[in-house]
Every structure is written in C-alpha cells, then in structure tokens.
Amino acid sequence: MSGGQDTGTATDADEARSPGPGDYAWFLEQSRQCVEDFIDAVDRNDSTGVFAAIRRNRDLLRGLGELTGTTIETPTLRKLIETAEAHGGAAKTSGAGGGDCGIVLIDPESSVSDIDDLLATWERADIRMLNLHVHQPDAVSDGVSDKE
C-alpha cells in the first residue's frame, strides 16, 4: 500500500521501509469511504453492498497489517473469515486486531445446512460463535432520537 500511487519497480529497500504518514492517511481515507459505503448500503437495504464493504474493510486491514508488520488477522481469524466466505458470508476482524474477534454476516438466503456446516467447521477449529443481535433504538430517524 503506497498511498495508491504506482512508484515503479520495488526494491528491497522500498519493501523494508517504514510506513509513512501518506500511507496511513491513505488507509484512513479508504476506511472512511468504506464506512460510508457500508452505511449507504445498510440504508438502502442492499446486502450485496454491505457484504462488499465488509470485504473491502478486511482487505484494508490486511494491507495495514502488512504495511506496519503487525498481526491484525491471526490464523484463527483467517479461518473464521475464509470459512464464512466459503459459506456465502462476509467477514472481517473486529477491534484492534490480534485478539481473535471477528464479525460475520451471513446471507439471509443461506440454507440451514450451509449455516450448520459453517458452525461445525468453526467448532472443529475451536472458534466460538457469540449469538448477538442488532438492537433497533426506539423512534430513531436520521440518527436523532425523538427523546432528545
């Protein structure tokens, strides 16, 4: 990740360099756009767009980890994500990284057997699912509560 600019042929020195402020600024801008795309897709009830934003965020986080030499996506998280993707879901790390916490969204059209197979695969890999649900706030319109 070099700020989105092609710098030509990479040398060993280029690959070993420390990330610069431009690299991180590029990551932040791309992350901001990814969040905006996610929110827009949620507002439009566009599951394809939601899944695309989740996948894009994963790619950005993996790139940041590679750029900084930091483990963001552990082997366990990689297994969680790859098996979710193989079963029609979209997934990414959650939190600061390295802590084996991930978010998985599954297509509501997925079959029960696909979901059961996914959960069995996770169980064999010692991945534990937390059964969480989205909370819908009371009377919220455009991010402003009627109680305010």
Identify the meaning behind each predicted range.
Residues 1-92, 103-148:
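C-terminal nucleotide
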Residues 100:
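Conserved glycine-rich beta-strand-loop-beta hairpin in the small C-terminal domain of fold type I
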